[in-house]
Amino acid sequence: MLRLKSLKKPVQAVVRRFATTSAPTLSVGDNIHGFNVLRTKEIPEFDLQATLLEHSTGAQHLHIARDDSNNVFSIGFKTNPPDRTGVPHILEHTTLCGSEKYQVRDPFFKMLNRSLANFMNAMTAQDYTFYPFATTNATDMKNLRDVYLDATLKPLLRELDFSQEGWRLENEDSKDKTSPIILKGVVFNEMKGQMSNAAYAFYIRYLEKIYPSLNNSGGDPLVIPELTYEGLKKFHADHYNPSNAKTFSYGDISVADHLEALNAKFENCEISKTPGNTERLPLEFSSAAENTRIVEEGPIDTLLDTSKQHKMSMSWLMGSPKDIYESFCVKIISSLLIDGHSSPLHQKLIDSGLGSSYSPNTGLDSAPGANIFSVGLQGVTESDLTKVETVILDTIKTTVAEGFDKGRIDGLLHQTELARKDQNAKFGMALMNGVLPGWFNQVDPLEALEWNSVLDRFNKDMEADPEFLQKVMKKYLLDNKYFHFQMNPNPDYEKNVQEKEDEILTDKLAKLTESDKEEIFETGANLEKMQEEPENLDCLPTLHVSDIPRSKPRVALEHTKNPYPIQWRLAPTNGLTYFHSISSLEGLPHEYYPFLPLFTSSLTFLGTKDKTMGQLEDEIKLNTGGLDFSVSCSSSPLSLPSSQLNFAMDGVALDKNVETMFGLFQELLRNTDFTNVEKLKTMIAASTANLSNALAQSGHSFAMLRAASDISPVKKIDDILGGVAQVRFLSELAAKSEQQLVDEVIPKLQEIAKFALTREQRFAVTCGQDMQTKNDELVRKFAESFETNESPFNISSLSIPMTTPTSTLFKLPFQVNYAGIAIPGVPYTHADGAPLQVLANMLTHKHLHREIREKGGAYGGGASYNPTDGFFSYYSYRDPNLERTLQTCQEAGEWSVKKDWSSSDLQEAKLSLFQRIDAPISVKSEGMALYANGLTYEQREKRRRQLLDVAVDDVKRVAKQYLVNPSGYSVAALGPGYETMDKKKWTVLE
């Protein structure tokens, strides 16, 4: 899995109040299992004890002791990419294809359903690669740790695995040696999909230019075919050894247990000095005589205005991540400059309409070796590019001169306080993600964990010098040169890339002898034979269904009426109150549905009649952890046709600020200025750009939803609210003039607002026992304020026109396809739901993964069954062989009926399902299954027992009943499609 820090911001570390574990205390200088203790540190603000150790081989280990049963482990290596062949990325894939101890094909995917881990993955970052997992089961921890260590340190690295995961030449039809020879490979196709994403293309080209010493770790599809098998093995030998390793553990399992396992592996490894694996630094442009300027070409987005597809950014060096305090200060500056409606750059760049949204690299990036602050815009016209640059510089100069409002600084610090108090069930993973990037680049991991001392120093500096932040800004942003990066849209970009790929293929084919072609055909046959061979998986460790408890404890909930229905979850919350409200939108005419996402976004974007959104946002940040509005459609657990369209409000605040939170909700709900057409147009442009980018990142999700929308009223509404239908709707709105928005859109939003305020609400509150009485009074007052409003519509039942199921292709300028197929299932309480859920998992792991990914070359593919929506789905992700995939899925039901399923197959599917079912959740999520979805404890317990009791005969029966002879079958795909598509069977939408 490719992981890009700047496109996927790391999870903000948040804290659940635990005591530190009672593990034996280690002292500096102690030696345990070959590891010397370098440093230890208590971090009382996070209730943890951190220990940094070093093995005799040079490997470092960071252990975070905390009384948390959700233990985390990771092994990682510094992997500076030597070129753009994607060797770190391909190696990440290939190491997981078998090891000395576990000589089976793809033990990583095999362990996905032999474990109860709530997280398992492998990720390639810009300059390091890591393999993390999390589990609450001690035996599971031991099993997975051994598999991960053996996979990374002792992989088989077979040439056929390299061909499958990296790239290869192969006959298009692997059974016909006369068929054309083409380029294939999982990573090759994954990166073709990535490069089709305009946001990714901008970011990666920017990164290559500002970090010329740091190549594209994911790989450029036009360069990937230059990587050799020998090059892969050498990169592993040079980089995947203990002297270059950093391991991490977190939780209540003893550090000695981890160190003993690591020592046993490290002692049997050859130690080699890793060449050229030092910290990589960006261009030293800050002291150059002139600002550095780079212009590149990139893909266009056909869903956006073709005249507004320029992207640009300006970047400044802002010190080293090794200076923890300085880095904290520049993070504060970055947030104050760009985050939210009250930030000066948001007002000048986005509110002004100069662009649709920030450029993909906007923000502070502290990896790999420098703090780089970037700000820019996308959705810019060519004529405005120079103006954008001038506006950015002038805004920074003005801010340095005038400073930031103290209320904004206080609001930002208040958000950090709330983040620390918020109870997160995946704190260990968040901690790991926060520490690793710096640790791999010589940032002290123990210093990086400190919080109170950094915050205390910042408060003292601000008190001593109110212009402290202005001086830091002047030092880095005014007194230094910047790096200017620009990407111009080229309508022929995808065509040119394809032509270059064709040239690479033609050049390779021209050098082939008849003997080479015969060898290519034989290699393809051997690869397919390897993929088909049954395996003995007895060497792999596994948990058992007996390790899954048949019952889960009931969460203590209270239900009261005051006279409004409230669900209470009374538990320790670190002084926070979590508030939820749901009201039915039944009776809203269906022609208003596409406007609902705009309505909810407007509430936190447009501002009110008396206050700008910037002013309101400052109040929200200073008094709450955020206010959120959303709409969703859900099915009844008892009957799929029974559905509910809901408007929801969610908020969190310190107990002392709950009344203020309700006041802010009132302000937004009653007084939002929907006539603010300039802000509305800006919001539509930003929403369109964001959803368009999501298509290229998660196209399979959009395809699955679109397919389901043809056979389910609930999914039809979901597609209108957040699927392809919403993308197309927003694209149409983005092309409208301000006057058209005034005439056609604003009245709809005003009517929805009036309607939403008439609906009866039900509430859920999670808080401490001592706050129940006070919160009960506040909720009652809040609810009473809505009673006098009348609906502008005649109330009717929820209904929406349906279309005939079909096969739909949304033709998009991608290099690969995304596909979704939907088949009706049953309601949550139906007895067949459990075997359908098990069947989907078995099909994915025992058939579709092999057929779609290993053979077909797609990055991913499988089946899923959503128990609450009652839909069976097939999907593929970044798929070069759409036609083959659709045929495979169509035949999957028959394959399931004929398959001789084993008891092991059944057990593995159940283990895999319960990874998610039994994953730890935060206190704020407890009771939400009942509140949001209407699922009672008794219904969920019955479903649990049904899943555990599913037999092979049940799986075969539902496969025949629902998949072989489905009552409905709908297909949707996003991408270029395939050459032999029957236009009579497909509806093609541009």
Swiss-Prot record:
SUPFAM superfamilies: LuxS/MPP-like metallohydrolase (SSF63411)
Binding site for Zn(2+): 89, 93, 190
Cofactor note: Binds 1 zinc ion per subunit.
One GO term of the biological process aspect: protein processing
GO molecular function ontology, one term from the record: ATP-dependent peptidase activity
UniProt keywords, alphabetically: Hydrolase, Metal-binding, Metalloprotease, Mitochondrion, Protease, Transit peptide, Zinc
InterPro entries: Metalloenz_LuxS/M16, Pept_M16_N, Peptidase_M16_C, Peptidase_M16C_assoc, PreP_C
Source organism, top-level taxon: Eukaryota
Cofactors named for this entry: Zn(2+)
Keyword Zinc: yes
Gene3D superfamilies recorded: Metalloenzyme, LuxS/M16 peptidase-like (3.30.830.10)
Active-site feature positions: 92 (proton acceptor), 165
Ligase found in the keyword field: no
Chief localization: mitochondrion
EC number annotated for this UniProt entry: 3.4.24.-
Transit peptide: 1-25
Matching PANTHER family: PRESEQUENCE PROTEASE, PRESEQUENCE PROTEASE, MITOCHONDRIAL
Protein's name in the database: Presequence protease, mitochondrial
